[in-house]
């Protein structure tokens, strides 16, 4: 398979901190690769909340910075030292700078070779699910090892990660208490496995949690909201409960005294996916789990909407409005 690789490509980048107006769709150099790297022509890339953290300055990055964290596409060039991939292989992978027509990644991963003949819809599904499914898998295995009978509080239960967590928690036999802002979102969360529902816009979350757990509190809280729900998560946990904080959708959690964890022996963790897949064996384990669950259709990845790459500014506004349900995907121009 021969492919003419251009010198310039279309990307989504930021070169300053700010609002949606700093998001730019521009020409940018196609990256050059080393002897151990792959050059991938992207077809689809997933939209994640983390992009907003770079744009707002919550996470530092060198400017200009091409956004994006996951994609699927085709290998169009490889370094001389690469032996495990061939030009023409279809792949799904996790890397920086995937809001682009071309991205590079080490041949050692995290990248997975897809079966020959993978369809366009499957490419979209893998790009939509890779980061969030692996996040949910690793968090429920390692950040807090969910056990049968556990009561788990889940915020943003109808978001991309939330819907995956609902399904995995049900598979593990946990009782999921889903929190969302509308009855429509809660209905979807229930369809995906939630057992108890709390409408955050009109119900007292803590009161409902204590009601559902007979006053005991939850074994774990999976909280991607951040500032607005931090105190609720702390209060809702039972003795020896685990607080899994993995997002800042409402803003950064203000500084607090660590002694506040002592009265109930609470464990607070702030995990990130990359810490669980850094080793090749870890990557293989979780990517195999991903394929098994998705290809067997045991796990349903709900795609909210697919946008052209140039319309990422609209997608960013949609996901940050916290009104979307499921995953947002960008289609890359070919």
Swiss-Prot record:
It comes from the Eukaryota. PROSITE patterns: QOR_ZETA_CRYSTAL. Its EC number is 1.6.5.5. One of its GO terms (molecular function) is mRNA 3'-UTR AU-rich region binding. Signal peptide: none annotated. One of its GO terms (cellular component) is cytoplasm. GO terms for biological process: cellular response to oxidative stress. It catalyses: 2 a quinone + NADPH + H(+) = 2 a 1,4-benzosemiquinone + NADP(+). Pfam families: ADH_N (PF08240), ADH_zinc_N (PF00107). InterPro entries: ADH-like_C, ADH-like_N, GroES-like_sf, NAD(P)-bd_dom_sf, PKS_ER, QOR-like, Quin_OxRdtase/zeta-crystal_CS. It is an enzyme of class 1 (oxidoreductase). Keywords: NADP, Oxidoreductase. PANTHER family: QUINONE OXIDOREDUCTASE PIG3-RELATED, QUINONE OXIDOREDUCTASE-RELATED. Belongs to the zinc-containing alcohol dehydrogenase family. Quinone oxidoreductase subfamily. This is Probable quinone oxidoreductase. It comes from Saccharomyces cerevisiae (strain ATCC 204508 / S288c). The gene is ZTA1.
């Amino acid at each position: 398979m021969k492919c003419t690789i251009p010198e310039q490509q279309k990307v989504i980048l930021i070169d300053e901190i700010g609002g949606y107006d700093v998001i730019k769709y521009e020409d940018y150099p196609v990256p050059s690769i080393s002897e151990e790297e792959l050059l991938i022509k992207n077809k689809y890339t997933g939209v994640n909340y983390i992009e907003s953290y770079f744009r707002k300055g919550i996470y530092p990055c060198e400017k200009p910075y091409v956004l994006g964290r996951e994609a699927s596409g085709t290998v169009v060039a490889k370094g001389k030292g690469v032996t495990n991939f061939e030009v023409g292989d279809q792949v799904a992978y996790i890397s920086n700078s995937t809001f682009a027509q071309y991205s590079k990644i080490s041949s050692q991963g995290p990248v997975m070779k897809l079966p020959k003949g993978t369809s366009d819809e499957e490419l979209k599904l893998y790009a939509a699910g890779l980061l969030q499914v692996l996040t949910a898998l690793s968090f429920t295995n390692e950040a807090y090892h969910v056990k049968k009978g556990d009561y788990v509080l889940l915020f943003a239960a109808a978001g991309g990660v939330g819907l995956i967590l609902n399904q995995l928690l049900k598979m593990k036999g946990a009782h999921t208490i889903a929190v969302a802002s509308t009855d429509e979102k809660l209905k979807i969360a229930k369809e995906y496995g939630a057992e108890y529902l709390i409408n955050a816009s009109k119900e007292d979350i803590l009161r409902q949690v204590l009601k559902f757990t007979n006053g005991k509190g939850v074994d774990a809280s999976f909280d991607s909201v951040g500032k607005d729900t931090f105190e609720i998560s702390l209060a809702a946990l039972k003795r020896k409960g685990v607080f899994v904080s993995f997002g800042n959708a409402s803003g950064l959690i203000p500084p607090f005294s660590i002694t506040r964890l002592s009265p109930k022996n609470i464990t607070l963790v702030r995990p990130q996916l990359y810490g669980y897949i850094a080793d090749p064996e870890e990557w293989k384990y979780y990517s195999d789990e991903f394929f098994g669950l998705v290809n067997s259709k045991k796990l349903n990845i709900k795609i909210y909407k697919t946008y052209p790459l140039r319309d990422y500014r609209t997608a960013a506004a949609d996901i940050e409005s916290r009104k979307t349900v499921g995953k947002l995907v960008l289609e890359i121009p070919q």
